[in-house]
A protein has these predicted regions:
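Non-catalytic, beta-strand-enriched accessory regions in extracellular/secretory proteins
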Residues: 102-118
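C-terminal beta-strand-rich structural cap/linker in extracellular carbohydrate-active enzymes
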Residues: 2-24
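Short strand-edge motifs at loop-to-beta-strand transitions and within beta-strands
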Residues: 10, 109-113, 157-161
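Solvent-exposed beta-strand/loop surfaces of large extracellular or lumenal domains
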Residues: 1, 138-160
């Protein structure tokens, strides 16, 4: 088999097989089972990496205006850009690195994204993964969180920032961007040792996953 990363490709040239190569390959002999697991019983599992809750829906506010209703982040970004007279990211435009360092002479703006996080359990050691962290400030339950990058998640453009421990209940995470047309708010990710229950667009943090059923 072959492993492909994003945007990888493989070109194959096929040639007619010789008669000897066309013979069927005998199937391997059946070996003994390595382990036997009853499908009805829970199986202990250990996650290879932290679990994740996707933060793709947020209330949003441009320049401290009243909060808009919860919306998918890219759609919220389109709404704000349309009001500012900027090109929408859903349209065709140059990739961000093409305009890196370009001064468009825009007025200064802020764009705040508020996430309502509901947890059924106490959580410690959680992190927030986000893009453009150098333009962001973070608060959790009204208290400032140092935007100190301590690693990355999945892709090096997704910086991770440690969040404070929190108890079971409802919490508010607000990410405020120094907003300009070259800053591109994207989905964020809450990662840590917890489970996630999802129903439609609503998710809650639950007990960490320790067992699974087949």
């Amino acid at each position: 088999y072959n492993t492909f990363d994003a945007h990888d490709s493989l070109l194959l040239k096929l040639s007619p097989a010789c008669p000897a190569c066309a013979k069927p390959v005998p199937a391997p002999e059946k070996g003994a089972a390595l382990n036997e697991v009853r499908a009805a019983n829970p199986v202990a599992v250990k996650l290879a990496e932290p679990n994740v809750m996707v933060l793709d829906m947020a209330r949003y506010s441009l320049d401290n205006e009243p909060w808009h209703e919860r919306e998918e982040i890219l759609r919220a970004d389109d709404d704000v850009r349309a009001r500012l007279g900027w090109k929408l990211r859903s349209e065709h435009f140059a990739q961000p690195w093409v305009t890196a360092g370009v001064d468009f002479g825009d007025a200064k703006h802020t764009l705040a994204l508020a996430f309502d996080i509901v947890s059924r359990v106490a959580v410690s050691g959680a992190k927030l993964a986000l893009e453009d962290s150098e333009y962001a400030s973070i608060t959790f339950d009204g208290k400032a969180v140092p935007t100190e990058v301590d690693g990355w998640y999945v892709d090096k453009c997704l910086d991770t920032v440690a969040l404070p421990d929190f108890e079971a209940g409802a919490h508010e995470l607000i990410v405020t961007y120094d907003y300009r047309r070259t800053v591109n708010p994207e989905w964020m990710y809450l990662i840590g040792d917890f489970g996630v229950y999802s129903c439609g667009s609503h998710s809650e943090l639950t007990e960490p996953v320790r067992t699974l059923y087949y």
